[in-house]
């Protein structure tokens, strides 16, 4: 190990083996790190909204569409949807947000706030400013934060739509994991509709570790589903299951078609997020499955 690396580890309280140099008996007296403030209100001003709309239409969408071949389906389900709404999607790539923002009708995209990981996108000023400007992003703690949850509530109260990734982090192998309960709790408490979205091919196009899509304009699919409305007396646990089933069903349509995915869901043979990953075998096999390019889809009969 280089001397520079050793110094870095020691400076961060780790020895050359990566183990903590602080005695465990001292843990109760270690001061908790205070939550940092992330000013994002400026991105929701009238001027910022106009600038962001222009950047998304004239820069973000052309660049994203030039590097990938998106197939967008289900936008017609949004025709009668009233804002505010919460859009949810599986999360496997940094392409996810650009694909969704660029494919949404402008009446939703211009009033959209995107939840972004506070410890990744808001740890450096330049990256935070760019993320907030392009996506109207607001910080989301992976392990929950009461203050940041209240910000999501304030945004909904002000009429902003939200784009959230209920898994809490990007998938390491391209497979969906179980949804955290926070998004369902938010939707139940505010009584807002949830729009499920399934993305396929984004992991193969730009997996973890890449800062740019792979060459060759890989195919990706963005599929919107029917809005889900919290039923009267429905708890967040029940809504969470409905959300997972909806996204899993949309994702399965890529191979099964609409009717095949609907039938698999009705028969109980459609694996929910988390269950599918467990049944997918070793991690290397799941990664291989996720990095296979999407094949051109032949026309299917609805009933097949």
Model-derived segments and spans:
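Non-catalytic C-terminal accessory region of glycerolipid acyltransferases
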Residues: 1-34, 39-40, 44, 51, ...
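Generic preference for hydrophobic
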Residues: 72, 87, 114-115, 222-224
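Helix-to-loop junction immediately C-terminal to a conserved catalytic motif
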Residues: 60-91
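A generic local structural motif
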Residues: 71-76, 100-102, 149-151, 208-210
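Catalytic core of membrane glycerolipid acyltransferases/transacylases, capturing the structured
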Residues: 79-143
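Short, flexible loop segments at the rims of nucleotide/cofactor-binding pockets, characterized by
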Residues: 62-68, 139-143, 173-174
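Alpha-helical membrane-targeting segments
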Residues: 44-67, 123-135, 207-217, 276
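Residue-level signal for beta-strand positions within conserved beta-sheet cores that form or flank
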Residues: 68, 110, 218-220
